[in-house]
Amino acid sequence: MMIAYTMTSRRGDTDLLLSEVADRLQGQGVKICGTVQINTERADSHRCDMDVRVLPDGPVIRISQSLGKEARGCRLDPNALETAVVQAKSALLQGAEVLIINKFGKHEAGGRGFRDLIAEAMMLDVRVLVGTNE
């Protein structure tokens, strides 16, 4: 059982790093599963759209929701996140060697999100790489 985490100091850098790691591993023939995050800047907002690409080969799922210009709350769409979890679990059960998760955040800390998938991967002796915030 092996679990590792990574974090960077600049916004979006962890997402880019994990995406690059996923691409390199896949290019080397390693069976990967999980998600990497894609942030897309919006002209009409100071906040970006957040999507995740389900590994190894899609789909891309929008995990952020627009709450309006003045909204200050969490923009994560929990239903979209759970859809990504289900898709990632399917790939895990097809014999993945490495699970990559874009972020261990509030949902995981609260027992939701990718938490159970991380535990399942560890029980299956699948290596886990997780992005975290500073």
List each language-model region with its residue ranges.
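Walker B catalytic acidic pair
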Residues: 103
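Helix-adjacent hinge/juxtasegments
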Residues: 55-94
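Conserved ATPase-coupling elements of RecA-like P-loop NTPase cores
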Residues: 107-114
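Glycine-rich P-loop/Walker A and Walker A-like loops and their local beta1-loop-alpha1 context
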Residues: 1-32
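Short amphipathic alpha-helical segments and helix-helix/interface helices
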Residues: 18, 22, 115-122
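N-terminal phosphate/diphosphate-binding loop that engages ATP/GTP or pyrophosphate donors
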Residues: 22-68
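Structural motif
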Residues: 97-98
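Sensor-1/coupling segment of RecA-like P-loop NTPase cores
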Residues: 120-134
